[in-house]
A protein has these predicted regions:
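Conserved helicase motor core of SF1/SF2 NTP-dependent helicases
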Residues: 356, 360, 364-366, 372-384, ...
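C-terminal accessory regions
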Residues: 607, 617-740
Length: 740
């Protein structure tokens, strides 16, 4: 079907009703042809008196009536006397209000804006405007119309006004000059625009496909893209091959560009087992810092723990049970070693061991900081230990000054604690762990707790796996399932999954079930379980208690399709219920939503009065209210309320169904795991294991038995390129460890 043609209106901006300067979303009135029209859309920056041509469509807003939703907007500098006066009187420029606008018009008439742009010294003829003020007025005028010019320029390359504004903020008034000289700057930090946009601009300027800027940008983009997939580095040959396939240039040409990047230290190279690995500099620095600090902790003399065995016996008498041999070993090492990895599957006593260590540390009056990578994991750690726990970000105190993430606690402002216990270690990426260990005092110890069989972090690195693989950091792996945990089929089957043994079938009173289904029938089954069967049989709240965890986003049982179906079933569109459209998503009051990328600036208010900042990837909440006028939403996440303005709605996704990857560090009362259609690259044991172990009271696997068998039979973990194990071994050679 042919795309419907956009309607067009033109006229003069009469009034600005609403403006968001961060993302360029505006609501304004346009007067033309004797009609005043309310226009809304992301248009950049407009002011009263400007001439505009808007293209889009009329929409009927439930609250505000008929509006014109602009998808494109062209502007022109005010030209006639009335429009020039309206612009000056709108207070768009510093030091100029209605009275000063009258004086400027009296002196310069319709040429006033030409004077401001090209001969600001003449403004000093106006009483009250000094030479300094005249220069400031010109600077703001050029900034305003420079941004407008850039928005129009980049629009021809399909770059949105919002992204164009980001480009202007990055490069300033010289943005067009910088981009025309090297369009591939747009693909780098911090913008990371799509490579095709840069290619379009480069073709416009007749730049060759094998120019140095394009080759170097392709190498950097390939490394950044793979960092997003978890790799901290890539083998040289794989980097060249991947970049070659991406931009269709021979590897030989890219090799020359790579050598130049290494020479200028834009990229770094390390040799591991005779193979050169290429790094982005910040990721190599992160792994080197981690290796150096862990080696220092391991080399440092052990701590004395007088009467430790007696104190463990007293704990056993107090608790009314005896610790298993491996638990005792872990407790002893936690009290004597400067760093320790404690790992094990569900039901093996990690929490019991950590609580014992906490009690002994507190008996010695040691200051302990408990932390985890996500808010949900920190909350769970607090519940399990009965002590305050925080996210790593909260512990270090995020500082987002100037749009750059840093932490108040760092190597110059160390944490005031003696021991850090870090839970869910498998989720921690290299940059965050680098920041944490940098903030530890020389005498501070660290205990890293996690399940090595779970999926690695969403961000780059595989820290827990690499530390264990190095064999050089003290590690205790708990492997005994305790009696109370054996009553749970969730726990029992989790261990069957890891060992590759057949799953145990659940009976009526069990907590694990497999329901066979396929395709659209599997989708209907999942929806029926969420909306009807589980709430009726177990009393679960379908939104707050039940979580669908999907291996993939695509297909009938992927997150995208299931969220559409579940939203329509659990929270359908209703007259009078506010909703917002953001890209392809519709948000309604009552929807379950998830934060999908870190926002270090968003303000939250805790119910009870405390205020703070930050929402992090994986945080889940409920939409409490929607303001359709300014397109903002209030979301409640546990005991916090956050206001999401229009420009931040892209950080949220509907979350009735989420991916297994996004569920890391969380637990849910009931989990439904659809495995009817799983792409081969996601068909592996660790992903299935991670999904099952997110369930606290009930786990239902719905899908095909052959898919389950393939997942359990595929022991391939997601291969992640990382040099941390090699760097640790270089810092702490095995023979030195054995000699000690």
């Amino acid at each position: 079907m042919a795309e419907q043609q956009l309607e067009q209106i033109e006229g003069t901006v009469e009034d600005i009703i609403y403006e968001n300067t961060d993302n360029g979303y505006m609501v304004f009135e346009v007067s033309g042809g004797g009609v005043v029209t309310v226009v809304c859309g992301i248009v950049g920056e407009l002011h009263a008196g400007e001439s505009v041509v808007c293209r889009g469509r009329y929409e009927n807003h439930a609250t505000y009536g008929r509006q014109f939703h602009a998808q494109e907007c062209e502007t022109d500098m005010p030209k006639d006397l009335e429009a020039v006066y309206a612009f000056l009187a709108s207070r768009s420029l510093p030091y100029i209000g209605a009275k000063t606008a009258d004086k400027i018009i009296d002196l310069f008439g319709a040429e006033a804006l030409e004077v401001i742009a090209n001969d600001p010294a003449r403004l000093t003829q106006v009483p009250g405007i000094s030479a300094d003020k005249a220069d400031r007025i010109q600077q703001e005028f050029k900034r305003m119309f420079g941004m407008r010019e850039l928005i129009a320029y980049l629009a021809q390359f399909e770059i949105s006004p919002r992204r164009a504004m980001e480009v202007f903020r990055t490069f300033g008034p010289g943005a067009m000059q910088a981009i025309s000289a090297n369009p591939y700057l747009l693909c780098g930090e911090p913008l990371q625009l799509d490579f095709r946009h840069a290619d379009s601009i480069a073709q416009y300027y007749h730049m060759e496909g094998d120019c140095a800027q394009r080759l170097e940008a392709a190498l950097l983009r390939t490394l950044r893209h793979n960092a997003g997939n978890g790799h901290t580095c890539l083998p040289r040959t794989q980097l060249l091959e991947t970049a070659s396939n991406f931009i269709h240039q021979p590897p030989e040409k890219l090799a020359a560009a790579l050598d130049e990047c290494i020479r200028t230290e834009e990229l770094r190279v390390k040799l591991f087992d005779g193979t050169p690995y290429i790094y982005l500099p910040d990721l190599l620095e992160a792994e080197e810092d981690i290796a150096a600090r862990l080696a220092m902790l391991t080399k440092r003399g052990k701590n004395t723990a007088h009467g430790l065995d007696k104190n463990i016996q007293i704990l056993e008498l107090t608790q009314g049970f005896a610790y298993a041999p491996l638990q005792k070993e872990a407790i002893r090492k936690a009290m004597t070693e400067n760093c320790l990895v404690l790992t094990g599957g569900p039901g093996t006593g990690k929490t019991t061991t950590v609580n014992a260590v906490l009690q002994l540390l507190e008996d010695q009056a040691e200051r302990v900081a408990l932390c985890a990578p996500t808010g949900r994991a920190a909350k769970r750690l607090s519940e399990l230990t009965g002590r305050k726990a925080s996210t790593i970000h909260r512990l270090l105190e995020v500082d987002y000054t100037g749009g750059v993430v840093s932490f108040i606690h760092n190597d110059k402002n160390l944490l005031k604690c003696d021991v850090v216990i870090l839970d869910e270690m498998s989720m921690v990426d290299v940059k965050l762990f680098q920041a944490l260990i940098a903030a530890l005092r020389y005498s501070c110890r660290i205990i890293m707790v996690g399940d090595a069989d779970q999926l690695p972090s969403v961000g780059p690195g595989n820290i827990l796996g690499e530390i264990i693989r190095s064999g050089l950091v003290p590690t205790v792996c708990l492997n005994e399932i305790f009696r109370q945990a054996k009553r749970s089929l969730i726990v029992e089957n989790a261990h069957h999954i890891i060992s590759g043994e057949p799953l145990q079938k659940g009976g009526k009173t069990d907590d694990f079930f497999f329901l066979e289904s396929d395709g659209d029938a599997a989708q209907r089954l999942v929806c029926d379980l969420v909306t009807t069967r589980l709430p009726r049989s177990y009393g679960f709240d379908p939104i707050r208690d039940i979580q669908v965890l999907c291996p993939t986003k695509l297909g009938p049982t992927g997150t995208q399709a299931l969220n559409v179906e579940l939203q329509n079933l659990l929270n359908p569109e209703q007259t009078g219920k506010p909703q917002l459209q953001s890209a392809a998503r519709v948000f309604r009051v009552g929807d379950k939503v998830m934060q999908v990328r870190n926002n270090y600036e968003i303000i939250w208010n805790r119910i009870g009065g405390e205020q703070g900042v930050g929402a992090y990837n994986g945080d889940i909440g409920i939409v409490e209210s929607i303001n359709t006028r300014d397109r903002s939403m209030v979301v409640r996440m546990d005991d916090k309320r956050l206001v999401y303005p229009a420009e931040n709605l892209g950080e949220l996704e509907i979350a009735y169904a989420i991916t297994v990857h996004k569920s890391q560090g969380s637990e849910f009362p009931a989990v439904i795991l659809p495995v009817a259609q799983v792409p081969p690259r996601l068909c592996y044991r660790n992903l299935f294991y991670t999904g099952v172990t997110r369930a606290r009271k009930l786990c239902i696997v719905a899908g095909r038995r052959d898919v389950v068998n393939r997942m359990m039979g595929n022991i391939r973990q997601n291969l992640r390129y990382s040099g941390l194990a090699y760097l640790l071994q270089a810092e702490l050679p095995p023979e030195q460890t054995e000699a000690e």
